[in-house]
Amino acid sequence: MPSTEYSILANKLTKRFGDFTAVDEITFDVLPGEIFGFLGANGAGKSTAIRMLTGLLKPTSGYAEVAGYDVRKETELIKRNIGYMSQKFSLYDYLSVEENIFLYGRIYGLSRRIIQSRMERLLEELNFYDQRKLRVGSLPLGWKQKLAFSVAIFHRPKIVFLDEPTGGVDPVARRRFWELIYNAAAEGITVFVTTHYMDCLLYTSPSPRD
């Protein structure tokens, strides 16, 4: 049975590519429902760390658990329990808003009935109902950002990983995006967000440790 004390646990997690060390013995833990900010400059290894934690890249050394599962041995179980949003938002520009939602719902193994029910609610929450037939490529960047995050948690994962999610958007869109993150955390989803913006750490909440 997986441990439930921490959503994410890393101990001296390291990744080397030949003589180059991309991630050097990082150690941290993340509690359930926490919004955890992972700060670092561009090229500091944040994306590499996420790839190890999501089971896409095997660590060179060290240990990590995600949702109670070993990142070396239980990658498929990890993938079933997480959501992921990349820097480029992971959306298909040539598909419509509702087609993107439906596609990811099916990828996550949801039934058509559940997808349709959740989609209707999501479109209303995002005020996207009138835009549901529009191609994603035609949407403003801030709208794409909100949609990409909503798609990443559409299957209601235990943890969602966000890799530089606020890059390239204006301060107003960034603030609105963080409101979505707060709502997800309030529903019990653990949020792991990488950023190189120091001010973004002001949005992260240490409340689960208080």
Q: What are these model-derived regions, one by one?
A:
Residues 102, 106, 113-131:
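Conserved ABC ATPase "signature" region
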Residues 203-210:
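Conserved small/polar residues in nucleotide/adenosyl-binding loops
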Residues 149:
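Hydrophobic anchor residue at the start of the ABC signature
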Residues 160-163:
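Catalytic Walker B motif of ABC-type/P-loop ATPase nucleotide-binding domains
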Residues 135-142:
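Conserved ABC ATPase signature
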Residues 154-158:
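A short, proline-enriched helix->beta-strand linker immediately N-terminal to the Walker B motif
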